[in-house]
From Swiss-Prot:
Residues 1-57 are annotated as: Disordered. SMART domains: PX. The PX domain binds phosphatidylinositol 3-phosphate which is necessary for localization to the endosomes. GO terms for cellular component: early endosome membrane; nucleus; plasma membrane. This is Sorting nexin-20. Residues 74-191 form the PX domain.
């Protein structure tokens, strides 16, 4: 696989949520923006509008009001709803069903996902590398050599894993880390983008519509992290001849890119939205104008289309 150690890829170890004005998409495969582990203050500062933003004072005020609203209300509750034993040719393991619900209001988009004990164990090892001091008092369920498939052990581990996730989520720098968000969303996102590359748009959409609400809740502190998945949904809807649905999800993506004109998805998204607007009889002139202004600020020898950009995500 080509290198993805650059801003905008999960392999990048520099600051996240920064202006991408100095980056140009390469043919190599960048993975989507994911948060770098670190203090919350740093993440919030990097999520600020860029210095070269063309937003008016009123737009900036509305931007910050929306951001504060997101930060204030998103709180998640974790449950291990069930467990099942899965047997394969050379292995046998327990799959735990995790249910994630937003508290404080009725959540019609509760997330349901499955992870095995080894996935939790991998998460713990990764977190220890970056947050050893922060999680030194967090109890991780021990591994047992025998008895892992007894009803008593599974019930005991379900409770322990629920407590483990809840305690991790209570630590701000951990819940906003790349490792924690990856644990809860990456397998599903990787599958969805694989379906997109294979032209299986209906299946890709089905997966994205289940995982994106969770990703949105986990990345409320930095909405730009949601952009690759939203753009993938746009591409799927568009290629399934659903221009209205594609345009609607594109508007969400543009909202996430407020004050982020230098982001690598900004120009390709505007181009796709202008074409959809023309097709739907909507105002496409203003979108074209924004695209032209963006291209003047950041000239590119060859611009990538939105589809060319999205199919490069989650290649490893």
């Amino acid at each position: 696989m080509a290198s993805h150690k650059h801003p905008g890829s999960p392999g990048w170890t520099g600051p996240i949520c920064q202006d991408m004005a100095g980056t140009t998409p390469k043919a190599s495969a960048p993975r989507p923006d994911l948060p770098r582990p670190g203090p919350e203050d740093h993440l919030e500062a990097q999520g600020s509008p860029s210095s070269n933003s063309s937003m008016t004072t009123r737009e900036l005020q509305e931007y910050w009001r929306a951001q504060k609203c997101c930060w204030k209300h998103v709180k998640l509750l974790f449950e291990i709803a069930s467990a099942r034993i899965e047997e394969r040719k050379v292995s046998k393991f327990v799959m735990y069903q995790i249910v994630v619900i937003q508290t404080g209001s009725f959540d019609s988009n509760k997330a349901v996902l499955e992870r095995r004990y080894s996935d939790f164990e991998t998460l713990q090892k990764k977190l220890l590398k970056t947050f050893r001091e922060e999680i030194e008092d967090v109890v991780f369920p021990k591994k047992h050599l025998i008895g892992n498939f007894t009803e008593e052990m599974i019930s005991e581990r379900k409770l322990a894993l629920k407590e483990y996730l809840s305690v991790l989520y209570a630590i701000r720098c951990v819940r906003r880390s790349r490792e924690f968000i990856d644990f809860l969303t990456r397998p599903e996102l990787k599958e969805a983008f694989g379906c997109l590359r294979a032209g299986q748009y209906t299946k890709a959409l089905d997966i994205l519509m289940r995982v994106v609400p969770l990703q949105e809740k986990l990345t409320a502190h930095c909405p730009v992290l949601l952009v690759p998945a939203l753009c993938a949904m746009l591409v799927c809807h568009r290629d399934l001849d659903r221009p209205a649905e594609a345009f609607a999800v594109g508007e969400r993506a543009l909202q996430c890119l407020q004050a982020r004109e230098g982001h690598r998805y900004y120009a390709p998204l505007l181009d796709a939205m202008a074409r959809l607007a023309y097709l739907l009889g909507k105002d496409f002139v203003s979108l074209q104008k924004r695209l032209e202004e963006s291209q003047l600020r950041k000239p590119a020898l060859r611009g990538f289309t939105l589809k060319e950009l999205t199919v490069q995500e989650y290649l490893s």
